């Protein structure tokens, strides 16, 4: 399997871990508890700054290359392109709502929770669609030259949470992950 696809699969594993963590925070929020808003905001900042700026653009390059090779699953790739945009928008909206709560803005709890649940649901569907449909197709159809070209064009950045940690920027998230690493 191409190294780039290995990296994307690892990113998905890490993101799934964050989605589970976000879901636990939302479950507590639903029960009337105060979630760790700083933790939730850091998770969303990570998604905005790594997934939206590095991970998704890399996947988009793979999708474009696949479309040059074949029309097979074009509809799925078009859905994934749209989902990248929608996920970015939902993430930003949810983060703004959480920051509003932190700054004591008057927001309905149920609507804030609904934003979070919608983001989680779409993100999980998105990961399943990529891993179940498009990544196997990429393994099958893309050549070594395709992978080299994608690698050259892909944005480069070290994962600030699961790679070379930016402990100052993502302190709360990093500390939480280190405390729950074996879960």
Predicted regions and their residues:
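Small-residue-biased structural context
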Residues: 1-183
